[in-house]
Amino acid sequence: KSCCPSTTARNIYNTCRLTGTSRPTCASLSGCKIISGSTCBSGWBH
């Protein structure tokens, strides 16, 4: 699961993923983070 700090970051992440880029790379580019659980930390709910 990916957690992003803003809607903008989420959009960047989603667009990046559409091009077939890996999750870790897209998370790094967009400022999002990948978590192993199912609930994002407070403030990372986008």
From Swiss-Prot:
Keyword annotations from UniProtKB, A to Z: Disulfide bond, Plant defense, Secreted, Toxin
Q: Which cysteines are joined by disulfide bonds?
A: C3-C40, C4-C32, C16-C26
- Gene Ontology CC entries for this record: extracellular region
Q: Which SUPFAM superfamilies match?
A: Crambin-like
**The keyword Cell cycle belongs to this UniProt entry's keyword annotation:** no
One of its Pfam families is Thionin
What Gene Ontology molecular function terms does this protein carry? toxin activity
Tell me the Gene Ontology biological-process terms attached to this UniProt entry: defense response
Record PROSITE patterns: THIONIN (PS00271)
> Subcellular localization, per the record?
Secreted
Report the family membership: Belongs to the plant thionin (TC 1.C.44) family.
Function of this protein? Thionins are small plant proteins which are toxic to animal cells. They seem to exert their toxic effect at the level of the cell membrane. Their precise function is not known.
Name used for this protein in its record: Ligatoxin-A
What species does this protein belong to? Phoradendron liga (Argentine mistletoe)
